[in-house]
């Protein structure tokens, strides 16, 4: 099974007040931690979707010097995160499509691995649940790729997934990172 992750990273980070994905946690950029969790979880390829002007972010991704990690540019990120997901899905060719927003650096690699293992057994839409709350990453079957690409960019992934409730499988995890993102500087540890 070939897994491909799409990591939307083209947002403006207005609530954070600047370059959120390059902010550090224990000396490591937030985006790098998100990518590292996906690699540790066994994802085969990672597509990071960036804004056209995000040169520093592109350099950060390119610093991985890992052919499994590369960028795609969302030509109009002002249309929202779903448009970044669509841009990434246009390039994603895999049996399991992993969606993890870039601002979720607390997800554990073991959680990603567990979700992929569950997907391999059930080939459904697989989501983690922490304390009863659904989170990310979400694993999608390739059958949803074209539906996502063709959808109106004003929609959300949640809108698409609501159409497929009968295909959803939730996995209880002991990983708060699946429901913890970074929106403001105070969301980072030690601040």
Where are these regions (language model features)?
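Nucleotide and nucleotide-moiety/phosphate-recognizing core
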Residues: 2-134, 166-173
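Conserved alpha/beta core of the MobA/IspD/sugar-nucleotide pyrophosphorylase nucleotidyltransferase superfamily
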Residues: 150-191
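Conserved nucleotide-sugar donor-binding
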Residues: 94, 135-146, 185
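Residues that scaffold the ATP/ADP-binding catalytic core of kinase and kinase-like folds
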Residues: 15, 95, 147-148, 190-191
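Short, well-structured alpha-helical patches and their helix-loop capping segments
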Residues: 107, 132, 136, 140, ...
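Short beta-strand-to-turn element immediately C-terminal to the catalytic PLP-Schiff-base lysine
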Residues: 23-25, 139-141, 181-183
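Residue-level recognition of oxygen-bearing side chains
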Residues: 21, 30, 111, 143, ...
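Short beta-strand and adjoining strand-loop segment in the mid-core
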Residues: 86-88, 143-148
């Amino acid at each position: 099974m070939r897994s491909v992750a799409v990591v939307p990273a083209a947002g403006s980070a207005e609530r954070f007040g600047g370059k959120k994905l390059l902010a550090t946690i224990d000396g490591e950029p937030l985006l790098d931690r998100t990518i590292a969790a996906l690699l540790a979880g066994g994802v085969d390829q990672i597509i990071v979707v960036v804004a056209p002007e995000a040169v520093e972010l592109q350099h950060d991704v390119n610093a991985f010097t890992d052919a499994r990690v590369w960028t795609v540019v969302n030509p109009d990120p002002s249309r929202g995160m779903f448009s970044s997901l669509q841009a990434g899905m246009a390039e994603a060719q895999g049996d399991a499509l992993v969606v993890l927003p870039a601002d979720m650096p607390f997800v554990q690699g073991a959680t990603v691995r567990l979700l992929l293992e569950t997907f391999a057994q059930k080939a459904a839409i697989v989501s983690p649940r922490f304390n009863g709350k659904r989170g990310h990453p979400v694993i999608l079957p390739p059958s949803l790729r074209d539906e996502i690409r063709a959808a109106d960019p004003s929609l959300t992934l949640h809108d698409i997934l609501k159409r497929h409730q009968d295909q959803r499988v939730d996995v209880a995890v002991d990983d708060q990172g699946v429901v913890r993102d970074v929106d403001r500087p105070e969301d980072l540890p030690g601040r």
